[in-house]
Regions:
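Short, hydrophobic secondary-structure boundary micro-motifs
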Residues: 57, 100, 139-141, 147, ...
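A short, structured surface patch at a secondary-structure boundary
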Residues: 104-169
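C-terminal terminal-structure detector
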Residues: 2-6, 161-228
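Residue-level "hotspot" positions that anchor or transmit function at local structural transition points
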Residues: 25, 47, 101-105, 160
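A hydrophobic, helix-centered structural microdomain
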Residues: 3-5, 14-16, 22-95, 130, ...
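Bateman (tandem CBS) regulatory domains
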Residues: 41, 107-112, 197-203
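Intrinsically disordered, low-complexity boundary segments flanking structured domains
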Residues: 55-59, 74, 148-149, 153-161, ...
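Short, glycine-rich, amphipathic interfacial segments at transmembrane boundaries or analogous
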Residues: 7, 11-14, 71-109, 170-196
């Protein structure tokens, strides 16, 4: 939940660019409570319901390439706290040491099964665990690695007022992000200077328009975007 007072925020978030977003969210505590309850209940239910799917995907991943079933990486969530995000592994073993921390289209590190999982966004399913643990929400700014968060402007830091999310309007808008990075000579640099600002503009707009019902709409829009 959101802290009660602006001055209770971590020092790095106590800047004037963040204050307007805090005030907006502070007036919508009922929606924030509904969001929190919905996240935990829905995540628990889906983990139980989808357990057979988890098993099938785990077998497919292990048979396709060497490595663990799950990929775990340090990301940043509410108030700048770091956590380990869970995903189904979609890349070759030790992929992070072989290239950028974001992927581009036709990235050679992505496995055959991994490509299928990514196209259907099934690699994100283990994040239900993160939601249940309170690290993430169904809807919110996608969690970035610390390196990218260090490039945030003061206003961008407002996205850290809420837990990171599995999906968002920005995620839907930039669902083909890897194509934008395909021809980049320096993928990390292009992501930070060109892609990230656009995504954060959408994320900040989402905070201004936040409501529990808007979250539900975003979840429905995400499902429709995946099916298209």
């Amino acid at each position: 939940m959101l802290v009660k007072n602006f001055h209770d925020l971590p020092q790095e978030l106590q800047c004037e660019a963040v204050r307007p977003y805090f005030e907006i969210l502070n007036q919508r505590r009922t929606s924030l409570l509904c969001k929190s309850i919905f996240d935990r209940v829905m995540a628990a239910g889906l983990l139980i319901t989808l357990s057979p799917v988890f098993l099938v995907l785990a077998i497919m991943i292990k048979r396709d390439s060497a490595g663990e079933v799950f990929f775990r990486q340090t990301r940043v969530t509410q108030y700048g706290r770091t956590f380990g995000i869970y995903k189904f592994r979609t890349m070759v073993k030790n992929a992070e040491s072989l290239g950028a921390q974001v992927t581009s289209q036709n990235d050679m590190r992505v496995t055959k099964v991994g490509n299928m999982l990514r196209s259907c966004r099934l690699d994100e399913l283990p994040q239900l665990i993160n939601i249940l643990l309170g690290d993430m929400s169904f809807v919110g700014t996608r969690p970035e690695v610390p390196r990218y968060v260090s490039a945030y402007t003061d206003e961008m830091k407002a996205t850290l007022l809420l837990p990171a999310g599995v999906t968002s309007i920005a995620s839907i808008t930039y669902k083909d992000e890897d194509q934008l990075l395909q021809n980049a000579q320096n993928v990390d640099e292009v992501y930070i200077n060109e892609v990230l600002p656009g995504k954060m503009a959408w994320n900040l707009r989402s905070i201004k328009e936040f409501s529990f019902l808007q979250d539900i709409k975003t979840m429905i829009d995400t499902v429709l975007a995946v099916l298209r």
